[in-house]
From Swiss-Prot:
Its main location: cytoplasm. GO terms for biological process: apoptotic process; negative regulation of extrinsic apoptotic signaling pathway via death domain receptors. InterPro entries: FAIM1, FAIM1_dom_sf. It comes from the Eukaryota. It is found in: Cytoplasm. GO terms for cellular component: cytoplasm. PANTHER family: FAS APOPTOTIC INHIBITORY MOLECULE 1 (PTHR13088:SF3), FAS APOPTOTIC INHIBITORY MOLECULE FAIM (PTHR13088). This is Fas apoptotic inhibitory molecule 1. The gene is FAIM. The keyword Cell membrane does not apply.
Length: 179
């Protein structure tokens, strides 16, 4: 019998991670799973409220599950990533990253650009890149298999919009996924 009470999907640069939390309110059990792997197991926790902190993904991003009593024997479970609510973290992240998903050579590829460092990730691995200045901006070149790729960064000309990043694979523009 499982005491699964909460499941979250967290999109990081190295992929989307599934976090599951079991809370046995009668047994005092707390179990945290990340991508199906047990990270924390505590038995006989007589204090039913509190928090569990662990790390997610290749960058060891700090995550905390908060357990709060809301009434009687009802509990609320919230996830924080790097000290922010999951919602706030994802809103902030959407401003600092671009994500593209494409299918080629019979495989799916998830490409993430971290705009602050210009790091490029593909399916959980940080790629070797080469930056180049061009007439209207910059290009960050990399390869996926036998495919030549680059992310073009150009000014939008509007202060609010800032820089526009476009992924080009084999001279074809790839649409960004909505975050």
């Amino acid at each position: 019998m499982t005491d699964l009470v909460a499941v979250w999907d967290v999109a990081l640069s190295d992929g989307v991670h599934k976090i599951e939390f079991e809370h046995g309110t009668t047994s005092g059990k707390r179990v945290v799973y990340v991508d199906g792997k047990e990270e924390i197991r505590k038995e006989w926790m007589f204090k039913l409220v509190g928090k569990e902190t662990f790390y997610v993904g290749a960058a060891k991003t700090k995550a905390t599950i908060n357990i709060d009593a809301i009434s009687g024997f009802a509990y609320e479970y919230t996830l924080e990533i790097n000290g922010k609510s999951l919602k706030k973290y994802m809103e902030d992240r959407s401003k600092t990253t671009n994500t593209w998903v494409l299918h080629m050579d019979g495989e799916n590829f998830r490409i993430v650009l971290e705009k602050d460092a210009m790091d490029v990730w593909c399916n959980g691995k940080k790629l070797e890149t080469a930056g180049e200045f061009v007439d209207d901006g910059t290009e960050t070149h990399f390869s996926i298999g036998n495919h030549d790729c680059y992310i073009k960064a150009v000014s939008s000309g509007k202060r609010k919009e800032g820089i526009i990043h476009t992924l080009i694979v084999d001279n074809r523009e790839i649409p960004e996924i909505a975050s």
